Regions:
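Extracellular/luminal Protease-associated
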Residues: 73-167, 172-174
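Long, well-ordered, tryptophan-enriched scaffold segments
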Residues: 173-185
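Noncatalytic luminal/extracellular "stalk/propeptide" segments of secretory-pathway proteins
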Residues: 2, 6, 10-118
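Conserved active-site and cofactor/substrate-binding residues in soluble primary-metabolism enzymes
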Residues: 10, 31, 47, 129, ...
């Protein structure tokens, strides 16, 4: 018989290491849901599943390129694709974002604005007002694309880093994210 610690480690290993992507609608999400359902049923739990339509999304290689550097980046889950050239504006606080002249620019987002993942704008279960405000400011900024330099101090201990700040199929501004270390280049 396995100890509780061994059992928990087995489940977490499968859900976090074996399945790398659990974004809603992805093959990994469906595999994780099936695995969880099987574990509950094996322990004689009665379950109900509520099905809903969700689209799958896959990212190709993403990068940020200037005349002098080329940086590998990660596409934000569900991001629209893009290939563009534009001037850059940089913001790190809500106040700077409110005052930014970002129309038709690529907005580099760092600091306070890149320390936590923002809830999807139409997520009804939990969506703090400050997240709604930031998303709204991005959408009304006129920015052509967003580059998030993810704040390492915002990463959860032992969690994914860098992590996507935006993971929202309803958010239509193309975005990528990179680590602070990559952003220093």
């Amino acid at each position: 018989m396995h100890t509780l610690k061994e059992t928990a480690k087995k489940h977490l290993s499968f859900l976090c290491e074996t399945i790398e992507n659990r974004c809603v609608g992805s093959k990994g999400n469906l595999a994780a849901t099936k695995y969880f359902q099987e574990q509950l049923e094996a322990n004689h739990w009665q379950i109900e599943s509520q099905e809903f339509d969700a689209f799958d999304w896959e990212s190709e290689k993403a990068f940020i390129e200037t005349e002098t550097i080329k940086l590998d980046a990660f596409s934000s889950p569900y991001s629209e694709p893009c290939n563009m050239e534009a001037e850059v504006a940089i913001v790190s606080t809500v106040d700077e974002l409110e005052k930014a002249s970002a129309r038709n620019k690529i907005l580099v987002v760092k600091g306070e604005l890149a320390k936590e993942q923002l809830m999807p704008k139409n997520f009804i279960f939990y969506n703090p007002d400050h997240h709604k405000k930031i998303i709204s400011l991005f959408e009304t900024s006129g920015a052509k694309a967003l580059i998030f330099i993810v704040n390492k101090s915002g990463a959860y201990e032992g969690g994914e880093y860098p992590f996507p700040v935006v993971e929202d199929g309803d958010f239509k501004i193309p975005s990528v994210y990179i680590s602070e270390e990559t952003g220093e280049q």
